[in-house]
């Protein structure tokens, strides 16, 4: 299957171009080369997709099909994902910049997602009768599971196929219809996936695909009274806007937003293990993960040894083409995102942080193969405190901030960890299981 040169909008059962002919390039982050051009949906395209989705949900038998029929399609999709794993992983890597190994893990994950929901949805196949003292024998009271209707799925650029399938599989298993809006930065695996869905037998009306920026069609999708649910993964500000928009029509809304995640390390940890854990937790996928351990909060007596070890390991991380098996991590996703990371590093220095390693692009003389791509060296910022913006705000890149707490002062460690508007995830490392358990139960991760 080739995507180059084919329309990338799927509306009302047909692949089509944008109504105004608009297109945008998508780039390979490794060398900034253009992979292909995708159609840029307009507001009118979005309205047409909503109307088509609503009409299909109302007039087709999709939502009334048996769970067995729909779950069979999910299992077929899982089979197809494994059959096409190599090509899907390659597409995900050239579009996002992540390593091929990471992309292959993502494909295995989404395969399991489809199989999981194919099994779980069958448990909803039979209505459950409610009995009890408040239900007379003459009354039949049932718990009935019904689809929501038209679901808009808006996905991020860092894990495009993974995040989509987490939303897509349960929505389709339960008889909903979906309108998919991938990030305009990394839409390719989503386009490929929709082709696969049609090939395995999903009804063409059960899915609409809009490739476009959120700015151009987002409000149309979230404000429409004909949309019943919006599921969004992405940034905090956009999430707030979507929640407000959905509130106007009182539609269902689920969001997963930013993270600024603490990684507390106590001095009793094995040093080598802690170095490996801290390094991996922050620099995987060049830090472009909402759950990365971007804030190291370390006990004072261990701090210098741990930070020195992380710096040494970070400087040995092999950066390169995600398709190269030797690469441990790839580039940032775009030139714009790299500029954001550079601005955070500059600001951190102005606020008093000390760069222990990284903080710049790779030297083009020493690393000529990285010169064209959106690379940025793994960066460790020492001497940070909780008032700094680089500590409080989500940089979403290869930046580790280091905060220290006095020996034995667990309360300060927890206070530092909880001093964030983000939360989302967190870690506690200690050989003392009781102390670790006591600490993580006090973490407030909204």
State where each predicted segment sits.
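Terminal low-complexity tails and localization/encapsulation signals of metabolic enzymes
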Residues: 1-38, 72-76, 108, 123-154, ...
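Residue-level signal for inorganic ion chemistry
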Residues: 32, 70, 92, 114, ...
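Conserved C-terminal structural/oligomerization subdomain of aldehyde/semialdehyde dehydrogenase
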Residues: 33-36, 227, 318, 368-370, ...
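Glycine-rich loop-to-alpha-helix module at the N-terminal edge of alpha/beta enzyme cores
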Residues: 35-125
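Short, well-ordered beta-strand elements within core beta-sheets of diverse protein domains
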Residues: 35-41, 58-62, 152-153, 263-266, ...
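Short acidic active-site motifs
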Residues: 45, 216-217, 412
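Rossmann-like NAD(P) dinucleotide-binding subdomain of oxidoreductase/dehydrogenase enzymes
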Residues: 126-273
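ALDH superfamily catalytic-core signature
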Residues: 229, 237-386, 408-411, 416
């Amino acid at each position: 299957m080739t995507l180059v040169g084919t329309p990338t909008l799927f509306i009302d059962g047909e692949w089509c171009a944008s109504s105004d002919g608009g297109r945008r390039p998508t780039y390979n982050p490794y060398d900034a080369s253009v992979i292909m051009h995708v159609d840029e949906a307009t507001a009118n395209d979005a309205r047409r997709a909503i109307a088509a989705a609503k009409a299909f949900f109302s007039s087709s038998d999709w939502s009334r099909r048996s769970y067995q029929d729909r779950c069979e399609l999910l299992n077929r999709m899982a089979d197809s994902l494994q059959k096409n794993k190599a090509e899907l992983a390659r597409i995900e890597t050239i579009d996002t910049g992540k390593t091929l190994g990471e992309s292959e893990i993502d494909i295995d994950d989404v395969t399991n997602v489809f199989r999981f929901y194919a099994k779980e949805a069958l448990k909803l196949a039979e209505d459950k009768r409610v009995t009890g003292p408040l239900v007379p024998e003459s009354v039949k009271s049932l718990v009935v599971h019904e689809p929501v209707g038209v679901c808009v799925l808006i996905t991020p650029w860092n894990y495009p196929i993974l995040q989509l399938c987490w939303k897509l599989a349960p929505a389709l298993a339960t008889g909903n219809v979906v309108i998919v809006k991938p990030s305009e930065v990394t839409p390719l695996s989503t386009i490929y996936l929709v082709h696969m869905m049609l090939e395995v037998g999903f009804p063409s009306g059960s899915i609409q695909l809009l490739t476009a920026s959120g700015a151009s069609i987002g409000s149309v999708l979230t404000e429409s009274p004909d949309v019943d649910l919006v599921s969004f993964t992405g940034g905090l500000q956009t999430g707030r806007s979507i929640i407000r928009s959905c509130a106007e029509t009182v539609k269902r809304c689920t969001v997963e937003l930013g993270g600024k995640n603490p990684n507390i390390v106590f001095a009793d940890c094995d040093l080598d293990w802690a170095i490996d854990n801290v390094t991996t937790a922050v620099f995987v996928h060049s830090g472009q993960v909402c759950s990365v351990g971007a804030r190291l909060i370390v006990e004072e007596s261990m701090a210098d040894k741990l930070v020195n070890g992380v710096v040494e390991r970070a400087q040995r991380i092999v950066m390169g083409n995600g398709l190269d098996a030797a690469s441990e991590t790839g580039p940032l996703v775009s030139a714009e995102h790299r500029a954001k990371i550079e601005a955070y590093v500059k600001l951190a220095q102005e606020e008093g942080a000390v760069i222990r390693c990284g903080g710049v692009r790779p030297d083009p003389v020493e690393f000529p193969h990285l010169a064209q791509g959106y690379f940025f060296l793994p960066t460790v910022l020492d001497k940070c405190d909780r008032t700094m913006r680089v500590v409080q705000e989500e940089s979403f890149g290869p930046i580790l901030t280091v905060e220290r707490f006095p020996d034995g002062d667990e309360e300060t460690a927890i206070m530092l960890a909880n001093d964030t508007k983000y939360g989302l995830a967190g870690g506690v490392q200690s050989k003392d299981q009781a102390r670790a358990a006591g600490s993580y139960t006090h973490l407030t991760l909204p």
